[in-house]
Amino acid sequence: MTMKIASAEFSRGIKGTDAILADGVPEVAFVGRSNVGKSSLINSLVNRKDLVKTSNLPGKTTEINFFSINNKKCYFVDLPGYGYAKRSPKEKESIEKLILWYLMYSEAPIAKAVLILDVKAGMTDFDREMVRVLREHDHPLVIVANKADKLNQKEMSAQLRAIKEAAHEAVVVQYSATTATHKERDALLRIIFED
């Protein structure tokens, strides 16, 4: 499915598993550690600066947020970040359970999982575990090495090589949510929406 994004709007946010939005509309799940730029990436893809609230402080997204794309042709699903050390143990556990429940047990029709990494940090143990979960549940996966504008070409090549080795054959794309051109954005959308 190739898609040009003509409209994007907030649909709903959920904190509990009983309120999951599973209405048969295909979902693209954006997942990753806290502060890797998930919200900024979604804003970049829909070509808006303000659809998804962003913050420089990690751990601000604490619910699963659904955004209707092209009048419910699909949803972009912004999941809370995992691995944020400054959350209380109870809050951390609650958020991680919510993420895993959505990915492993909900009836959500996940068309693609987009795992966002901070290219500078590379793939962490948390990210490797997420790749394992996504593969075990047969979610088609693309890995976005975000914040590509923060590295020079030599550093970028080394980081991409290491990420690809750890990615177990998943497609890996370098990207910068803050500096991406229309061409780069359209190329990433094609990868996300291809079957």
Regions found by a protein language model. Give the residues of each.
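Canonical P-loop GTPase G-domain recognition
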Residues: 5-18, 150-195
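Amphipathic alpha-helical transducer elements in NTP-driven molecular machines
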Residues: 61, 92-96, 100, 124, ...
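Conserved C-terminal guanine-recognition region of P-loop GTPase G domains, centered on the G4
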Residues: 97-171
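Conserved nucleotide-binding/hydrolysis micro-motifs of P-loop NTPases
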Residues: 60, 74, 81-83, 120-122, ...
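Hydrophobic aliphatic residues
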Residues: 45-49, 103, 167, 192
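Conserved G1/Walker A P-loop phosphate-binding module
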Residues: 1-86
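Conserved nucleotide-sensing/catalytic segment adjacent to the nucleotide-binding pocket
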Residues: 71-110
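Short, glycine/charged-enriched secondary-structure capping and boundary segments
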Residues: 24-25, 45, 89-92, 128-132, ...
